[in-house]
Amino acid sequence: PGGVCLLLLLLCQFMEDRSAQAGNCWLRQAKNGRCQVLYKTELSKEECCSTGRLSTSWTEEDVNDNTLFKWMIFNGGAPNCIPCKETCENVDCGPGKKCRMNKKNKPRCVCAPDCSNITWKGPVCGLDGKTYRNECALLKARCKEQPELEVQYQGKCKKTCRDVFCPGSSTCVVDQTNNAYCVTCNRICPEPTSSEQYLCGNDGVTYPSACHLRKATCLLGRSIGLAYEGKCIKAKSCEDIQCTGGKKCLWDFKVGRGRCSLCGELCPESKSEEPVCASDNATYASECAMKEAACSSGVLLEVKHSGSCNSISEDTEDEEEDEDQDYSFPISSILEW
């Protein structure tokens, strides 16, 4: 009798261990309540939930691979999904996030950056070229979807470097879309290893590499832009210039040079687009429509100012004043940062 009891005890222990191991660990529970994204099979709930992830879930069924495949592909996930975390207790969401119970009484990690040490309460311009109402709003955007987002300067994003105060040793530069950015100029450019690295700038100067063009742009404080790849040549027309990457040569009659530009862009049918006055003194429905006309004619067109050619804003006059003082070439040139 003693031997039988011992055998039964061992059998029960074996079944208990097997049931503890049988189960599947999943990385999330979907809105339909099913487990999705299989992490590992044959794990106990304790082992699965020890990862500490808020979204980790577990299913008890020890099923074969065919059933798992059907669940994931045809059924929207595994049924009888058990979330590892039912409350916010002992949930570590990481820096800048906090665990809160949502409307369905489920724990969720939400963005909650520490904004207590922020001294500047006004709007800021982010590295993405967008204006945020304050630095705390920018930190929330960084937490949600843009981990590399930072403040580049205080105040709203501007179209000119006037009144832009860049932090540290960075310098204000106007890019090809006429937006002001703070960049660092003191980079060391390596010597080119191949003649294929040469670039012709929109200023007619040959640069040894893209790094040299970026540095020259930075020191100048506004966009120089890339005309075409290779050394600058004395072209008489666009027929002398070979464009790469699906670009088309547009001729700039003002300076007698060609420039390779991207064409074929479809203009969106949006009523929010602002009309622009182009360098041919014609008004276009949008900047995209102007580029479309330029690609069609083969003649380079630049934005003189926003709005129709019959109206000139004060900001435009300021920008034109800056252009005469600093640089005689167009500021809306293409700059490949």
UniProtKB/Swiss-Prot annotation:
Residues 23-96 form the TB domain. Pfam families: FOLN, FST_N, Kazal_2. Residues 1-22 form the signal peptide. Disulfide bonds join C25-C48, C35-C81, C49-C84, C88-C99, C93-C109, C111-C143, C115-C136, C125-C157, C161-C172, C166-C182, C185-C218, C189-C211, C200-C232, C238-C249, C243-C260, C263-C295, C267-C288, C277-C309. Keywords: Disulfide bond, Glycoprotein, Repeat, Secreted, Signal. Coiled coil: none annotated. The keyword Cell inner membrane does not apply. Residues 87-110, 160-183, 237-261 form the Follistatin-like domain. Residues 309-337 are annotated as: Disordered. Glycans are attached at N117, N281. It is found in: Secreted. Its main location: secreted. Residues 105-159, 179-234, 254-311 form the Kazal-like domain. Residues 314-326 have a biased composition (Acidic residues). Binds directly to activin and functions as an activin antagonist. Specific inhibitor of the biosynthesis and secretion of pituitary follicle stimulating hormone (FSH). This is Follistatin. The gene is FST.
